C-alpha cells in the first residue's frame, strides 16, 4: 500500500512540475481593453480563467486605460502588446501614420444611438447641446452633425448619465450596451421616436476589435494567431454559459472596485453577444467586414477626418498601404 501511495505522490509531483514548467514558458501578452472591467470584455476574461490562453502557451495580462494612459498611448509606447479600438478609431490612427493590424474582431454592428432628453426626435434638435464621451472621438455623431447641419453644441462627459438626467443637455450619444442600459435602469422613459439608432440610418459600422502594431504582427505571427483562437473559444463559451461568465466578470469587477452590479452586467453581456451576430448571416463571425471598412473610410474622408483611404488589406496586415504591394 505504501508503495502505491508513494507512486501516486510521485505521479502528482511529476504532473505539477510539468504544469509549472508550462506556465514558466508561457509567453506574456499584455492586452489593454477599452475600459475598466465589465461584461463588454467577458469572453477574454473567460479565456483567461478557463485556461484557454494557457492552453496555447500565452500568459495574457489585462490592463485598463486611464486618464493618463489611453489605449493608444500604451500601445504606441510599448506599454502593451495589443489594444482595443473601434474600427473607425483604428482607421483614423492608421490614416494618420501609425500602422495597426486587426488580430481579432468581436463587434459586427454599431451600438451607437442618440437619446433625446425631452422626447423629441434627435434630428429636430438643431443647435442643441449634445453630450458625447471624452475617451474617444464620437465619429458618427460628428459626421451626423456635419451631414445634417445639426450645429450641435458639444458637451463632453467622462462616463456617467448625470449630465443627461439633470437636464444639462438636450441629448446624449450613448452605446446600447452601457449608458442606454443605465438610463433604462434609472427609469428614464425612452420612446422609439426619441432615439436615433445609427445602424438604422446607413451608419452600421463595426466597433471594437483587438489591434497590434504592424511590427509586432510581423515579428509575432504565432502569438497573435493563438491569441485570436483562444479569444474566440472564450467568447463562444461565454455565449453558452452566461451565468458562469457573469461570475467571472464580477470577479474582475470586484478586484478593481468598479461601481456596477450583476443586473446591469447581465444586460450588458446579453447586448454585447447580440451585437456580435452579423446582420446578414445571422452568425457570430469574429471578422472585419471589408464593406464596413469601405463605408467607414468613405464617411470619414468625405467629412475631412482622414485624407486617404485605409484598405481592408492594410488593416489585416496584408499590405502596407492602399496602392502599395496589393
What is the role of each PLM region?
Residues 220-305:
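Secondary-structure end/capping motifs
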Residues 24-26:
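Boundary at the C-terminal end of the N-terminal hydrophobic targeting segment
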Residues 293-326:
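Conserved C-terminal helix/tail region of periplasmic/extracytoplasmic solute-binding proteins
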Residues 28-157, 163-174, 196-198:
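Short, glycine-/small- and polar/acidic-enriched structural segments
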Residues 2-12:
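Bacterial N-terminal signal peptides that target proteins for export
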Residues 20-21:
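N-terminal signal peptide c-region/cleavage motif recognized by signal peptidases
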Residues 88-89, 157-163, 167-258:
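Pocket-lining segment of extracytoplasmic ligand-binding domains
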Amino acid at each position: 500500500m505504501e508503495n502505491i501511495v508513494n507512486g501516486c505522490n510521485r505521479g502528482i509531483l511529476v504532473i505539477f512540475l510539468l504544469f509549472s514548467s508550462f506556465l514558466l514558458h508561457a509567453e506574456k501578452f499584455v492586452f489593454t481593453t477599452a475600459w475598466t472591467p465589465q461584461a463588454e470584455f467577458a469572453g477574454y476574461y473567460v479565456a483567461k480563467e478557463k485556461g484557454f490562453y494557457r492552453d496555447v502557451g500565452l500568459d495574457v495580462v489585462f490592463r485598463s486605460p486611464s486618464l493618463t494612459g489611453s489605449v493608444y498611448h500604451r500601445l504606441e509606447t510599448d506599454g502593451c502588446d495589443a489594444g482595443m479600438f473601434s474600427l473607425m478609431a483604428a482607421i483614423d490612427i492608421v490614416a494618420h501614420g501609425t500602422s495597426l493590424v486587426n488580430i481579432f474582431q468581436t463587434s459586427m454592428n454599431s451600438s451607437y444611438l442618440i437619446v433625446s432628453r425631452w422626447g423629441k426626435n434627435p434630428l429636430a434638435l438643431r443647435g442643441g447641446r449634445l453630450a458625447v464621451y471624452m475617451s474617444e472621438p464620437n465619429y458618427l455623431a460628428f459626421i451626423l452633425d456635419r451631414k445634417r447641419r445639426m450645429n450641435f453644441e458639444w458637451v463632453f462627459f467622462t462616463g456617467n448619465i448625470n449630465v443627461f438626467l439633470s437636464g444639462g443637455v438636450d441629448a446624449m450619444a450613448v452605446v446600447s450596451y452601457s449608458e442606454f442600459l443605465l438610463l433604462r435602469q434609472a427609469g428614464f422613459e425612452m420612446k422609439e421616436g426619441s432615439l436615433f439608432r445609427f445602424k438604422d440610418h446607413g451608419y452600421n459600422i463595426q466597433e471594437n476589435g483587438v489591434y497590434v502594431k504592424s511590427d509586432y504582427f510581423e515579428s509575432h505571427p504565432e502569438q497573435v494567431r493563438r491569441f485570436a483562437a483562444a479569444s474566440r473559444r472564450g467568447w463562444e463559451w461565454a455565449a453558452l454559459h452566461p451565468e458562469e461568465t457573469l461570475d467571472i466578470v464580477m470577479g474582475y469587477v470586484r478586484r478593481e472596485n468598479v461601481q456596477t452590479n450583476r443586473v446591469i452586467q447581465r444586460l450588458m453581456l446579453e447586448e454585447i453577444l447580440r451585437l456580435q451576430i452579423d446582420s446578414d448571416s445571422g452568425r457570430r463571425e469574429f471578422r472585419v467586414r471589408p464593406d464596413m471598412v469601405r463605408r467607414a473610410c468613405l464617411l470619414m474622408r468625405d467629412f475631412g477626418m482622414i485624407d486617404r483611404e485605409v484598405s481592408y488589406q492594410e488593416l489585416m496586415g496584408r499590405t502596407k498601404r492602399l496602392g502599395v504591394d496589393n
